[in-house]
Amino acid sequence: SGDPEPVLTRLDHARDLAVASLQEARRSVMVLRPRMPEGTDLLGALRLLTDRLLAGTDIQVELSVLGKARALRTNLQEELLRIAQELMTNALRHGKARWVRVVLEYEPRQVCLHVEDDGRGFDPTAAVAGYGMRSIRESICKLGGRMDIDSSEGLGSRITITLPTRRWRP
């Protein structure tokens, strides 16, 4: 009964949990409500966000723009940034993704945010119950937009957020 091995194994496990919890807490505090850094466009802000959010992980991220980028009001940019943050956090935390692709698509009357990953995927009807997805839906509704989810278990996810820009021109 003097074998220290089971105790050491439990201590190792407890330490690993504590380290993982601390990393998650740091990520959460850092990205509670992202703001647009002064002098940075939306793509630059997304780059900063992904660098911080995915630091210390092996996840590959690809950011790109389709269409001609244009100025959007700060509140719309910050909302898109917050939504991108939530979707990437979901891919990391729940989806166990190895890569995430984020595309900003500027169209004449709207802007689209596409977030795609190779994670575990999910049942879109069940995802509505989560706080993060519910919060995204509420924000999109207030802005007159929509969210389209293409995901199934085991096959990754592709989520498209479409927001009108006509109400939000600077």
Identify the meaning behind each predicted range.
Residues S1-P170:
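Coiled-coil dimerization/phosphotransfer module
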